Amino acid sequence: MLKLSSSQPDFAERLKALLAFETAQDPAVDAAVASICADVHHRGDAALVEHTNRFDRMQAAGMADLTLSREQLEAAWLRLPADVRDALSAAAERVRRYHEKQLAHSWSYEDEDGTLLGQQVTPLDRVGIYVPGGKAAYPSSVLMNALPAKVAGVGEIIMVVPTPGGERNDLVLAAAYIAGVDKVFTVGGAQAVAALAYGTETVPQVDKITGPGNAYVAAAKRRVFGVVGIDMVAGPSEILVICDGATDPDWVAMDLFSQAEHDEIAQAILLCPSADYIAQVEASIAKLLPSMPRRAIIEASLAGRGALIQVSDLAEACEISNYIAPEHLELSVADPDALLPQLRHAGAIFMGRFTSESLGDYCAGPNHVLPTSRTARFASPLGVYDFQKRSSLIRVSQAGAQKLGRIASLLAHGEGLTAHARAAELRLEDGTPR
């Protein structure tokens, strides 16, 4: 695992190299996705069934074999052990309660001349959520995508989830049940994204697609953006831990593992002023790694993109963190509130030694769909606001038309747009150009 010090003359260059991630699209993936999307666009259900059978080793005769009813979702819920149902319910309630705080409302006000100005907030009509399936089963992704949409008041939530070899995951289906998903189709990959974006005879066209997926799903989301909205095209998972050197090093090592185990190209970084503590964390990593079921993935991630970085103090750690703009930022320090004003760019900030990132992944309440690859500089977590849209409201009174008409007329003539000017002038009491 790479060890750096901010005092090194070449630190800035080495940090930049560490953060570099090749986001360019793979031409082979692009070509395959373009072909699949075009096929689903033109042939609808037939193409969707064909590609699903091919890629997911299915033998579906038609879309009826790839459609799950609410009764089937409920049955999956009832098959779960009681303690798992309780855990899923508790997580769902916390996620719902948090997102209810984000709900935006319409507003308006009147000028002194009676002109009304405002904003009308409305939910999207229909959204599609993509959930990974098969062995990579993520019920938490169902909750994090469906519940904000539900809170926003979205009219219909469509979920797609691949079931390779016909393998359905009860946890995922149960999460869809308690989150209020309206329709579930057991399809995945680029073909599922295309079906949601363009619609087929069975799959309704949606207004927005959210949720994580592999390179083919990401490429398909890029391709259909503009036809529908998308949440983001996410890169590898990331965690940055700022530690003052007083947290149990085993805790920090395991927190680094928690993201490294996602993917060989996930990123885990520690910033700490103490060289001795960094050595302790390094020892904890060596001690704990052999017991991890996903050891090979963690090792590859830490070796390829991980780092233990010594900084001069916590203030410098915050400066470096703002440059990194991590997906997950842990403040494993005595007084996290003191650091908060110095931090501008992070998807989610986990404050205090007891706040492990994994709690945010499952049940704390805030969304775990977060900006990656330094996009936290300008992007935000998925939320209710992603499932609402805003329309401006303008109702000009007769008196207001006299004042605004003259302003608009002058500006429109200045831009050489005569019809714009005349449309305003005709509403003036004397109807004359100004």
Swiss-Prot record:
> Biological process GO terms, please?
L-histidine biosynthetic process
Which CDD domains does this entry report, sorted A to Z? Histidinol_dh
A GO molecular-function annotation: histidinol dehydrogenase activity
Pfam entry (one) = Histidinol_dh
Residues recorded as binding substrate, renumbered to this chain, are S237, Q259, H262, H328, D361, E415, H420
Q: A GO CC term?
A: cytosol
Protein residues bound to NAD(+) = Y130, Q191, N214
Where does the record place the catalytic residues?
E327, H328
Record flagged with keyword Oxidoreductase = yes
Lineage: superkingdom: Bacteria
Indicate which residues the UniProt annotation says bind Zn(2+). Q259, H262, D361, H420
Indicate yes or no for the key word Glycoprotein.
no
Q: Kindly state which keywords UniProt assigns to this record, in alphabetical order.
A: Amino-acid biosynthesis, Histidine biosynthesis, Metal-binding, NAD, Oxidoreductase, Zinc
Q: In which pathway does it act?
A: Amino-acid biosynthesis; L-histidine biosynthesis; L-histidine from 5-phospho-alpha-D-ribose 1-diphosphate: step 9/9
EC top class named in words: oxidoreductase
Enzyme Commission number(s) from the entry: 1.1.1.23
Q: Which HAMAP family match?
A: HisD
The UniProt family comment states: Belongs to the histidinol dehydrogenase family.
PANTHER family in alphabetical order: HISTIDINE BIOSYNTHESIS TRIFUNCTIONAL PROTEIN, HISTIDINOL DEHYDROGENASE HDH
Known role: Catalyzes the sequential NAD-dependent oxidations of L-histidinol to L-histidinaldehyde and then to L-histidine.
By what name is this protein known? Answer: Histidinol dehydrogenase
| Source species | Chromobacterium violaceum (strain ATCC 12472 / DSM 30191 / JCM 1249 / CCUG 213 / NBRC 12614 / NCIMB 9131 / NCTC 9757 / MK)
